[in-house]
Design a protein with these regions (language model features):
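Radical SAM enzyme [4Fe-4S]-AdoMet core and its adjacent flexible, acidic
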Residues: 206, 210-335, 341-345
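N-terminal [4Fe-4S]-dependent radical SAM core
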Residues: 5-33, 55-95
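Short glycine-enriched, charge-decorated loop/helix-capping segments at active-site entrances
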Residues: 112-116, 214-222, 406-407
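Short amphipathic alpha-helical recognition elements used for nucleic-acid or partner binding
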Residues: 33-49
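Active-site and channel-lining beta-strand-loop segments
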Residues: 22-24, 337-353
């Protein structure tokens, strides 16, 4: 490496540890730890400019990991360009709602269940859209959403087979996942979905059976916990494929926090020793239309999430959530230029949390697409210099233009320094710079 002038990256997060430093760069997703040489590294990263000498192994390593960058590099302009283009992958992404009806009535749900099952005409239009546009992409990523998508299994099967055929014929990769409440996810239905190349599953279990029963119940008020857990256990015991993954989401209420140990025991009893099942813990939030004050009383505070991170690190930080803290890991699908939502009536949208807003409507599949409005949507969410996001060190992770619905930073990123500090306790997550005295 030739000698050159370098400077500290604008996207270094420095965590002070009792035995040294942890540094995480949000552009590269690299973490390093330094121990004996912590003061040396701290001084380098606090300098305005540094001479990068090939013989200085510490400087070379910091440069390789992105903690130091070329002196003339404009990192903010690079990120702005990426955000303007909205290109966060090589795949066309379709979020499809085969029905907007649901067999559950969750207390915090933002959906209104006003539309039914997707018609054959809309299905035909979706297949035609894939046929006409897939050539410019490496493949197709389909996410089945709802309502409850398994209430329209025939639509999923019919559409999947046709889209798979298009991708096979055009030599494109086909991936699929599904967000489901898990009630209809019997072993028989799971086998059907697996044959349709659906490999990623998100299922929600809201804690202890009694708490889950108060938050996630059937349309007729009946309980759902046991059915969901039995379905998951049967899949775990009978399906050995390593290509499937289950994200077990838990929406924590304030009440659930004091029962977390009991909940962990339930998870361990039923789903332990299987890396295909990963936890995703969030605090209950308001994504719209919640008017019942008793439901709002369930909401936790940022400090509650931080408590979960501190006390249950191994549950909160896993192979799935680590991806959220990597470059582009938290980019909302609605900010991706090549991602669209198609609801059961064929309306083209960007966000699944705002299905009835004209702001979130861009035409009808197979009939018209308002490209100008879509471009305005993308541009409106560009971060300007007056935004608190503009100089944020977390910006390369989410590019988030704080969600127009939530109007705040994601809880995961609000607690990012704590999460990174906990990650720095596991040697699998970092490289060591300099020397470390063996104790």
């Amino acid at each position: 490496m030739e000698n050159q002038r370098v400077k500290p990256s604008a996207y270094n997060i420095i965590i002070e540890k009792p035995d040294g430093l942890a540094i995480y760069n949000t552009v590269t997703g690299k973490m390093i730890r330094c121990f004996n040489d912590a003061d040396v590294v701290r001084n380098i990263l606090n300098a305005e400019m540094v001479n990068n000498y090939a013989e200085n192994s510490i400087i070379v390593k910091l440069y390789e990991c992105g903690m130091l960058v070329d002196a003339n590099r404009d990192e903010i302009r690079e990120i702005e360009k990426k955000e303007r283009e909205g290109k966060f992958g090589r795949y066309m992404q379709l979020i499809l709602l085969p029905t907007e009806q649901c067999n559950f009535r969750c207390v915090y749900c933002y959906e209104r269940f006003e539309r039914g099952i997707m018609s054959l005409e809309i299905q035909d239009a979706i297949v035609n859209y894939v046929e006409d546009n897939i050539e410019q992409f490496s493949g197709l990523n389909v996410i089945w959403f709802g309502g409850e998508p398994t209430e329209a299994l025939d639509v999923i099967e019919r559409l999947s087979l046709r889209m798979i055929e298009v991708c096979k014929r055009k030599r494109k990769v086909y991936n699929a996942g599904i967000t489901t409440n898990g009630y209809n996810l019997t072993l028989e239905n799971f086998k059907k979905l697996k044959k349709l190349h659906i490999t990623e599953y998100q299922v929600t279990i809201d804690g202890l059976p009694a708490i889950h029963a108060r938050q996630r119940f059937l349309l007729n008020g009946e309980k759902t916990f046991e059915v969901i857990m039995d379905n998951l256990k049967e899949i775990k015991e009978n399906i050995k494929s390593s290509t499937i993954t289950f994200l077990i989401r838990t929406n924590f209420s304030k009440e659930m926090l004091e029962h977390t140990d009991e909940f962990c025991e339930i998870l361990d009893k039923n789903l332990s020793n299987d890396k295909r099942f990963q936890c995703f813990w969030q605090m209950i939030g308001d994504y719209g239309y919640i008017k019942d004050e008793s439901v709002k009383n369930l909401f936790g505070m940022p400090k509650d999430y931080q408590w979960l991170v501190e006390k249950y690190t191994s549950r909160v930080i896993n192979s799935y959530t680590r991806g959220l803290y990597g470059p582009d890991g938290g980019v909302c699908y609605a900010l991706k230029r090549d991602s669209i939502v198609i609801d059961s009536a064929g309306s083209i949208r960007k966000c699944t949390c705002d299905l009835d807003s004209n702001v979130n409507y861009f035409g009808k599949i197979g009939e018209n697409f308002d490209a100008k409005k879509h471009e305005e949507w993308m541009n409106k969410r560009n971060i300007n210099e007056n935004s608190s996001c503009y100089f944020c060190k977390k910006r390369p992770l989410c590019h988030n233009r704080a969600c127009y619905k939530a109007k705040k930073c994601l809880p995961n990123y609000s607690a990012l320094n704590l999460i990174l500090s906990q990650m720095a306790e596991d040697s699998e997550n970092y490289e060591i710079i300099g020397e470390k005295t063996n104790e």
